[in-house]
């Protein structure tokens, strides 16, 4: 794992491996985090919330510079594999650590498994696009979440025997935790009611660096809805909004929430505005209207058959879709194929050579 969101996808995998081992299967796993055990993005309750073990090892590579981080992971993960040999290295998503660890494994003659393979933005200026393409090209097992990802891989000449449509593993985590969610303490203090607030998440620096665009987006939100707006934001985002004078009596800015508390806010929202692909997927699973501040979706199924709409960075489009939401005319979504909570089981069965 290379970042906090990766753990939402490794948690069900660790449980599936534990279950397979308990059933007598010859399988063990070692969880590696490329960052530090003092990483402030990993809240103290994260691993308890996800019901998963803490990483077995932290590589302590925290550089923000791409090349230094890449080099640090290459060296540290090579040392890890020398000390703890593996038959398969499974990497998640499309981050710099994903690519770096797959390169190390391949150079050492170890099989690479890519979880959430085949996602494409078709924009080579996006670092994630390069990371994903390189990782997919090195992988022996390509675990996909949807048929669009399968098609992307097919179009690049990937051997179909290596592609395994296992479903969306994030849904495994969502299904597992639906009865474990925790109402944030601030929920009652703010006087919020379920299905009567708009949830807003914002993280991407590319948008935060565009002052005029950001102000126009918030203007559209505040003009087009009279509901409370709940926004769990990192300090750098909060400071940016403050510097731009973006404020309202209906805008409730919270600190980043623990996993189960944030899940509660997502589950009970009237609508969601986000720049997170994971949140958009969760919204489709829950049938909640979602407006994504991006021009592409990692899983296009959230748009074609789910509840997600891409608005890019256009305040005009956002205003239009908020009108649709206000009128109660949002599209009724459906669950994409294999969003059934069994992706992790399929992955383990495939690695054991048992999946049909």
What positions do the PLM features span?
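Leloir-type glycosyltransferase catalytic cores
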Residues: 145-148, 176, 309-356
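Donor-nucleotide binding loops and adjacent catalytic segments primarily
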Residues: 44-47, 182-268
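A nucleotide-sugar donor-handling region in carbohydrate enzymes
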Residues: 37, 41, 60, 135-210, ...
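Short acidic-hydrophobic, aromatic-tinged amphipathic segments that line or gate anion-handling sites
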Residues: 57-60, 144, 253-256, 309-314
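A donor-sugar binding/catalytic signature common to diverse glycosyltransferases
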Residues: 91-92, 103, 114-115, 142, ...
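Active-site and donor-binding regions of nucleotide-sugar-utilizing enzymes
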Residues: 1, 7-18, 22-23, 46, ...
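Glycine-rich phosphate-binding loop signature in dinucleotide/nucleotide-binding domains
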Residues: 80-87, 192-193, 268, 354
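Conserved nucleotide-sugar phosphate-binding/catalytic loop shared by glycosyltransferases and other
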Residues: 25-69
């Amino acid at each position: 794992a290379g970042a906090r969101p990766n753990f939402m996808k490794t948690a069900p995998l660790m449980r599936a491996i534990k279950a397979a081992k308990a059933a007598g299967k010859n399988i063990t796993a070692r969880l590696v985090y490329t960052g530090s055990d003092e990483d402030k993005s990993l809240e103290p309750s994260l691993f308890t919330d996800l019901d998963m073990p803490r990483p077995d090892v932290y590589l302590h590579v925290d550089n923000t510079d791409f090349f230094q981080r890449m080099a640090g992971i290459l060296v540290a993960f090579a040392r890890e594999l020398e000390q703890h040999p593996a038959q398969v290295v499974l990497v998640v998503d499309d981050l710099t650590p994903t690519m770096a660890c797959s390169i190390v494994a391949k150079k050492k003659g170890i099989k690479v498994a890519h979880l959430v393979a085949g996602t494409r933005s078709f924009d080579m200026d996006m670092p994630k696009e390069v990371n994903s393409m390189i990782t997919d090209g090195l992988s022996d097992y390509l675990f996909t979440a949807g048929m669009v990802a399968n098609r992307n891989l097919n179009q690049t000449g990937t051997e179909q025997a290596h592609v395994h449509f296992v479903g969306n593993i994030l849904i495994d985590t969502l299904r597992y935790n639906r009865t474990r969610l925790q109402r944030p303490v601030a929920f009652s203090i703010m006087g919020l009611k379920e299905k009567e607030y708009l949830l807003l998440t914002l993280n991407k620096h590319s948008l935060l660096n565009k002052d005029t665009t950001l102000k126009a987006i918030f203007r559209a939100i505040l003009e087009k809805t009279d509901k409370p707006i709940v926004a769990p934001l990192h300090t750098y985002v909060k400071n940016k909004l403050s510097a731009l004078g973006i404020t309202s009596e209906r805008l409730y800015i919270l600190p980043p929430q623990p996993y189960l508390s944030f899940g509660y806010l997502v589950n009970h929202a009237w609508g969601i505005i986000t720049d997170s692909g994971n949140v958009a997927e969760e919204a489709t699973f829950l049938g909640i209207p979602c407006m994504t501040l991006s021009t592409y979706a990692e899983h296009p199924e959230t748009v074609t058959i789910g509840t997600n709409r891409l608005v890019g960075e256009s305040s005009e489009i956002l205003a239009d879709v908020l009108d649709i939401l206000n009128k109660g005319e949002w599209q009724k979504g459906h669950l994409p194929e294999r969003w059934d909570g069994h992706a992790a089981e399929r992955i383990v069965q495939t690695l054991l050579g048992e999946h049909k």
